[in-house]
Regions:
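Amphipathic, small/basic residue-rich leader segments at the start of a protein or domain
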Residues: 1-80, 101, 105-108, 266, ...
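C-terminal helix-coil-helix/basic helical segment that borders enzyme active sites and/or dimer interfaces
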Residues: 28, 262-269, 280-335
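Internal helix-loop-helix
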Residues: 39-100, 104-109, 151-157, 279, ...
Length: 382
C-alpha cells in the first residue's frame, strides 16, 4: 500500500488549515456555513466528475481535508448527505439533466438533502418499504412514512425509496425519487425527542407529495440497485475524519480517568490502552481500504469494528466518572431542556452505533456471505 502524503498534499493541508482558522470560528448558522464552504470550493472534492462548481482533489487531499475539518472548530456539516451520498449516486446513475440540475446547488451549499429510506416496519429489512409512488400524468404521488430521517427539519429535498409497482417482487418494484420538502400539507416533518434530550432525527409523513417524472434516478423499478450503490458511498474518506473525533473523545476519557483517580486501577489502564491500540488499527485499515487494498467486505468490517469500539468507549467513560456519571444538572426542570455532559452524551448516543448505517447483524451477514463464502442466509420472498 502506498498512502503517503506528498509535498503537494502538505501544501494543500496548509491551505486547508489556514482557511479553516480564518473562517470556522464562531459559526452560528449552519446553512450560511454551507454556502461559505461552497463559495470557497470545499464541497465536492471527492466527486469523480468536475464541472459542477466543485473543486477536484486527489484521494490523499480528500483525506487531508476531512482530517483538518475534524480538528477545526467548524460545526458539524448539514450538507454532507447531498455531497457524500446523493451526488456520487447521481454521477453514477443520473441523467445529464439530473446532474446539471442538482449537483451545482449542492456544490454551492444552496440546497440541503435528507435520506428517505427507513420506515417503522422497514429498517434493516429495507426491501420491505411500504411508501408508495403512484404514477400520474406529470410525475408521481407519494404516500407513506419515513423515520430516523437525519436533517429532515433543515432539508430542501429528500431522496426517497418508494414502491412504484406493488405487484412486483420486493426488490423489483422500487424506485429512487427526488422529492421537494417544501410541500405544505403534503410533507410533514416531526422531530423525534431522544434520550439525550436532543432531536437529531425526524419522522417524515408524505400525504400525496409530488415528485416530477424526470426526477426518478436510474429509471422506474431500478430503485433497489440505486439505493444499494448509495449505501456503498456511506463509508469512505469520512471514516478517517470520524476517527479524529474518536481520538479526541478518547483523550477526554483519559484525562477524566487521571483526574478522578480511576487511572490508578490497572483494569482501567488496560482498557484505555486497548482503546488506543484498536483506534490506531482502525485508522490503518481505513487507509488500506482507501488505498485499494483489502477485500470486498472491508467496509462492513470497518463498520463492525468502529461501532463496537465506540460503544466500549462510552461504557468506559461512565466507569471512570464513577457515581457522577449518573448525576443530572442541579437546575433541571421539566420546563427546560436538560443538558448532558460529554461522557453522558457519549454513552447514550453510542448505543445506536451498532444499529444505524447497517446493523451489526447485517454487517456480519455480508462478511459471512461475501468474504468467507458461507451459505447464504435463508430468506423469504426475494
Amino acid at each position: 500500500m502506498d498512502f503517503g502524503f506528498t509535498e503537494e498534499d502538505e501544501t494543500f493541508r496548509t491551505e486547508a488549515k489556514r482557511w479553516l482558522a480564518a473562517h470556522a470560528t464562531g459559526v452560528q448558522d449552519r446553512r450560511t456555513w454551507e454556502r461559505t464552504l461552497g463559495q470557497a470550493g470545499w464541497i465536492g472534492l471527492g466527486w469523480p466528475e468536475p464541472g459542477y462548481g466543485n473543486r477536484t482533489a486527489t484521494l490523499t487531499q480528500q483525506v487531508v481535508w476531512a482530517e483538518e475539518y475534524a480538528r477545526s472548530p467548524a460545526p458539524p456539516r448539514s450538507g454532507h448527505i447531498g455531497e457524500n451520498l446523493l451526488a456520487p449516486t447521481l454521477i453514477a446513475h443520473g441523467t445529464p439533466e439530473q446532474k446539471s440540475r442538482f449537483l451545482p446547488p449542492i456544490a454551492a451549499g444552496d440546497e440541503l438533502w435528507c435520506q428517505g429510506y427507513s420506515e417503522p416496519d422497514a429498517g434493516s429489512d429495507l426491501a420491505g418499504v411500504r411508501t408508495t409512488a403512484v404514477r400520474e400524468p406529470r410525475g408521481y404521488r407519494i404516500t407513506g412514512q419515513k423515520i430516523w430521517t437525519s436533517l429532515a427539519h433543515e432539508a430542501d429535498w429528500c431522496f426517497v425509496l418508494a414502491r412504484t409497482d406493488p405487484g412486483a417482487r420486493r426488490h423489483h418494484g422500487l424506485s429512487f425519487l427526488l422529492v421537494p420538502m417544501d410541500q405544505p400539507g403534503r410533507v410533514e416533518v416531526r422531530p423525534i425527542r431522544q434520550m439525550t434530550g436532543t432531536s437529531d432525527f425526524n419522522e417524515v409523513f408524505f400525504d400525496g407529495a409530488h415528485a416530477r417524472a424526470e426526477h426518478v434516478v436510474g429509471g422506474e423499478g431500478n430503485g433497489w440497485r440505486v439505493a444499494m450503490s448509495l449505501l456503498g458511498f456511506e463509508r469512505g474518506v469520512s471514516t478517517l475524519a470520524q476517527q479524529i473525533g474518536f481520538a479526541e473523545e478518547l483523550g477526554r476519557v483519559v484525562r477524566t480517568a487521571v483526574d478522578t483517580g480511576a487511572a490508578d486501577d490497572p483494569v482501567v489502564r488496560d482498557r484505555l490502552v486497548r482503546q488506543w491500540a484498536e483506534l490506531r488499527t482502525m485508522r490503518w485499515n481505513a487507509l488500506r481500504t482507501l488505498g485499494g487494498v483489502g477485500d470486498p467486505g472491508a467496509p462492513s468490517v470497518a463498520k463492525l469494528l468502529w461501532a463496537g469500539w465506540h460503544q466500549r468507549l462510552g461504557e468506559l467513560a461512565t466507569r471512570v466518572r464513577g457515581a457522577a456519571a449518573g448525576a443530572g444538572p442541579a437546575d433541571w426542570s421539566p420546563a427546560a431542556p436538560y443538558e448532558l455532559d460529554e461522557s453522558q452524551h457519549l454513552f447514550l448516543f453510542s448505543r445506536a452505533d451498532t444499529i444505524y448505517g447497517g446493523s451489526d447483524q447485517i454487517q456480519r451477514t455480508i462478511i459471512a456471505e461475501r468474504v468467507l463464502g458461507l451459505p447464504r442466509e435463508p430468506k423469504g420472498d426475494v
